[in-house]
């Protein structure tokens, strides 16, 4: 019979013993540079122009398109559990609403401005972030205004985006978050807010490091925002472009961004770390995007992972990389899970 063998060892060095530093659950929390809290969570809301809408999104488990009339019942239990912030995305479904310049984006009767006013009235404690983009509202599905050849008209695009951002702020948004990735839009938005006497009370949260890729499909299903032709690779960053991302971070910070979003998050932790160093005095926000969320759910449904465990692992990774805020479709679950952990 084989007998287990033990090699002779040297006496253990004092500096080699680490286990005593994390053998207790509280110690494991103390070892975390940042601990996930409810205040960090930002929950995306898809608000449709059908006020009574409540439609499940097949590719986004547990997420719905919601009309303004359904918001109160939907948000009330989440706010009671500690939800502090939402980010609004408008979904125009009425035929004929979309046009080449995204006129419906800041329509006073449209879903976003109606959503802002409703939430300000019924949930004044909620911090309202509005995504600023044109893709949901343009007939071509791109994020700006186009030239005749289908390329982005930068000047008209940033002028239009700035107008949308200012109108969201006028309606009561606490924060505007431009996600279009068109050069120079942060400067125009900031200038527009200054000229409207709104800059002192409107936070500009820039999607400075937003990458093109294959993780946005469920979102585009939810927002009905897929481009009708081409793709967005000429204005969203290439996945391998770390240097470009660093330049974009520096640019948006210099143009007046008050905070930075890195999107997607799981595959871009190096960019998140770069952002926390380049923009060290600004809050860094991770966006756990629809494709990442759907992947976790798919893996959990197959029994490959436990959803709660993998959700904490992924989101703690964002904090470790430098994020202080997280836009996440898992916010409702985390409101329960964090109570269980405590």
Curated annotation (Swiss-Prot):
EC number(s) per entry: 4.2.1.24
GO terms under cellular component: cytoplasm; cytosol; nucleus
UniProt keyword annotation of Phosphoprotein present: yes
MF terms (GO), sorted A to Z: porphobilinogen synthase activity; zinc ion binding
Signal peptide: none
Modulation of this protein's activity: Inhibited by divalent lead ions.
Cofactor binding, note field: Binds 1 zinc ion per monomer.
Class of enzymatic activity (EC top level): lyase
Annotated 5-aminolevulinate 1 binding sites: 220, 232
Modified residues (Phosphoserine): 254
Functional pathway: Porphyrin-containing compound metabolism; protoporphyrin-IX biosynthesis; coproporphyrinogen-III from 5-aminolevulinate: step 1/4
Function: Catalyzes an early step in the biosynthesis of tetrapyrroles. Binds two molecules of 5-aminolevulinate per subunit, each at a distinct site, and catalyzes their condensation to form porphobilinogen.
Catalytic residues of the enzyme: 210, 263
Residues holding 5-aminolevulinate 2: 290, 329
Entry's family note: Belongs to the ALAD family.
Additional free-text comment from the UniProt record: Present with 11600 molecules/cell in log phase SD medium.
Disulphide bridges: none
Natural source organism: Saccharomyces cerevisiae (strain ATCC 204508 / S288c)
Quaternary data: Homooctamer.
Domain of life: Eukaryota
Obligatory cofactor(s): Zn(2+)
Catalyzed reactions: 2 5-aminolevulinate = porphobilinogen + 2 H2O + H(+)
Binding site for Zn(2+): 133, 135, 143
Record-linked InterPro entries: ALAD, ALAD_AS, Aldolase_TIM
Protein name, entry field: Delta-aminolevulinic acid dehydratase
């Amino acid at each position: 019979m084989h007998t287990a063998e033990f090699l002779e060892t040297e006496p253990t060095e004092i500096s080699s013993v680490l286990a005593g530093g994390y053998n207790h659950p509280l110690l494991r929390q103390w070892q975390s540079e940042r601990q996930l809290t409810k205040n960090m969570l930002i929950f995306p809301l898809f608000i449709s122009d059908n006020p009574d809408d409540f439609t499940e999104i097949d590719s986004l488990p547990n997420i719905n398109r919601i009309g303004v009339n359904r918001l109160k019942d939907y948000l009330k239990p989440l706010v009671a559990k500690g939800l502090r912030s939402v980010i609004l995305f408008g979904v125009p479904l009425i035929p004929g609403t979309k046009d080449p310049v995204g006129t419906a984006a800041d329509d006073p009767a449209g879903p976003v401005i109606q959503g802002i006013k409703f939430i300000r009235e019924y949930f004044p404690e909620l911090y309202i972030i509005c995504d600023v983009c044109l893709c949901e509202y343009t007939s071509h599905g791109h994020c700006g205004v186009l030239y005749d050849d289908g390329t982005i008209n930068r000047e008209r695009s940033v002028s239009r985006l700035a107008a949308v951002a200012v109108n969201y702020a006028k309606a009561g948004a606490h924060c505007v978050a431009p996600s279009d990735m068109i050069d120079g839009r942060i400067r125009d938005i900031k200038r527009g807010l200054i000229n409207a006497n709104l800059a002192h009370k409107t936070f500009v949260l820039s999607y400075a490091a937003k990458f093109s890729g294959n993780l946005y499909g469920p979102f585009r299903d939810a927002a009905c925002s897929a481009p009708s032709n081409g793709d967005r690779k000429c204005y969203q960053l290439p996945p391998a472009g770390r240097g470009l991302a660093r330049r974009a971070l520096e640019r948006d910070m210099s143009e007046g961004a008050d905070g930075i979003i890195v999107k997607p998050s799981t595959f871009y932790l190096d960019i998140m770390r770069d952002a926390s160093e380049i923009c060290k005095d600004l809050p860094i926000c991770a966006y756990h995007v629809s494709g990442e969320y759907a992947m976790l759910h798919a893996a959990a449904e197959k029994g490959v992972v436990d959803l709660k465990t993998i959700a904490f692992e992924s989101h703690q990774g964002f904090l470790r990389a430098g994020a202080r805020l997280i836009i996440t479709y898992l916010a409702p679950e985390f409101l329960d899970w964090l109570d269980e952990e405590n």
